[in-house]
């Protein structure tokens, strides 16, 4: 039997504007999700027919269980959430089950869209990666999470339409709604979505004016007493739309930082912003090596932001020169952001300070990070503007 997380949906189907509704047909995988990939229509559960008007997310067993457990945990935290707020969150009418045999339609695009998921598991017979030819022999390694089908994502809406003033106002209103009405309620209950971005906001098929937040695969909840740091935060992958300070949530980084400061103190070297910068610079280099994709996305955003502004003022206007300038701008911004956090939440580093040096990462998480990580996510929608060519916008003169 499927595991179910249901509440009755009393909404009435209304005639909708097709530009908000994803009209593709078939069972093919069509979008990557956090730690999994999504199929439309839903994949059948073992012993059950496919559910109409549902989609399926295929995940490795451990990730499926974590995501489903967190959806249940978050739902229990949000029992008193106003209906006018919860309508923006896809948390109800969700089930987890064993996947039935995948049909030829289900296998379309599976290696392209689900490649990141399939490569994590080896086929029992060949010991090679799972692919379209052998996945049906390895379904015991996967679960599916079935959820109500929604319309087109905000990302695709922006990608598929000319952005005129009406569309821009509508997108801005979505961001404002989340910042003012949705995220504060999540913050109060200690819930972090952790992966807010334009592809994870889909328009409701019942009411196209309601942008619904999906994909809770990177979510977590804070401790009830708002002390300490959730264990999950130490293991989740860094996303490009996260605050730059996210990589500080590592026990190794914290231990290295405190050890570095104690060494400076022992050698009677004055601890200043510039001396701490010596520690942060190699951390940034390590971040680039370990998070190449995230780094390249952020660099492209910075490049689009500054490209037109500084090009006219540099003598060497070659691509390599421009790339070096963007690299310097981004690295300086990143390093200074992290420095601000370290300086603000490190105690006993003053010239006359006594006692042990303490970096209070827990205080930073509960006072600041808990409240701004999803804000960074929702504001990342604006990044897409920066990546569009000017011809994408249809603005009256």
Regions found by a protein language model. Give the residues of each.
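Arg/Lys-rich, intrinsically disordered low-complexity tails that mediate electrostatic binding
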Residues: 1-21, 25-26, 147
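ATP-binding glycine-rich loop module of kinase domains
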Residues: 34-122
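Conserved structural core of kinase catalytic domains
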Residues: 85-170
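Activation segment signature within eukaryotic-like protein kinase domains
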Residues: 175-176
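Conserved hydrophobic alpha-helix
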Residues: 182-186
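Catalytic-loop of the protein kinase fold
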Residues: 187-204
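C-lobe/activation-segment region of protein kinase-like
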Residues: 210-212, 216-390
């Amino acid at each position: 039997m499927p595991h179910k997380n249901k509440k009755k949906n009393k909404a009435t189907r209304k005639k909708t504007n097709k530009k908000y509704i994803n009209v593709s047909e078939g069972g093919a995988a069509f979008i990557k999700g956090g730690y999994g990939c999504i199929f439309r229509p839903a994949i059948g559960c073992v012993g059950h027919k496919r559910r109409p008007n549902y989609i399926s997310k295929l995940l490795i067993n451990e990730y499926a269980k974590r995501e489903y457990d967190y959806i249940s945990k978050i739902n229990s935290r949000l029992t008193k959430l106003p209906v006018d707020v919860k309508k923006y969150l896809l948390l109800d009418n969700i089930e987890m089950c064993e996947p039935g045999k995948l049909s030829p339609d289900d296998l379309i695009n599976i290696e392209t869209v689900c490649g990141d998921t399939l490569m994590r598991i080896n086929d029992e017979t060949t010991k090679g990666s799972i692919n379209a030819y052998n996945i049906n022999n390895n379904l015991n390694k996967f679960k599916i999470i079935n959820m109500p089908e929604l319309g087109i994502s905000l990302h695709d809406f922006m990608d598929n339409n000319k952005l005129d003033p009406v569309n821009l106002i509508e997108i801005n209103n979505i961001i404002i709604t989340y910042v003012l009405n949705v995220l504060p309620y999540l913050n109060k209950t200690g819930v972090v979505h952790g992966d807010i971005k334009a592809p994870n906001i889909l328009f409701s098929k019942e009411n196209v004016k309601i942008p619904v937040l999906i994909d809770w695969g990177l979510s977590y909840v804070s401790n009830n007493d708002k002390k300490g740091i959730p264990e999950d935060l130490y293991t989740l992958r860094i996303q490009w739309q996260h605050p730059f300070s996210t990589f500080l949530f590592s026990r190794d980084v914290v231990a290295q930082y405190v050890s570095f400061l104690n060494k400076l103190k022992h050698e009677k070297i004055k601890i200043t912003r510039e001396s701490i910068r010596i520690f942060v610079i190699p951390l940034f280099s390590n971040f680039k090596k370990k998070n190449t994709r995230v780094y390249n996305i952020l660099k492209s955003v910075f490049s689009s932001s500054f490209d037109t502004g500084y090009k006219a003022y540099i003598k060497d206007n070659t691509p390599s020169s421009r790339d070096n300038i963007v690299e310097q701008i981004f690295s300086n911004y990143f390093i200074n952001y992290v420095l601000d956090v370290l300086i603000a939440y490190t105690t006993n580093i003053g010239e006359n300070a006594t006692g042990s040096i303490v970096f209070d990462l827990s205080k930073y998480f509960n006072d600041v990070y808990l409240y701004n990580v999803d804000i960074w996510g929702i504001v990342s929608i604006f990044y897409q503007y920066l990546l569009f060519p000017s011809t994408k916008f249809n603005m009256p003169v």
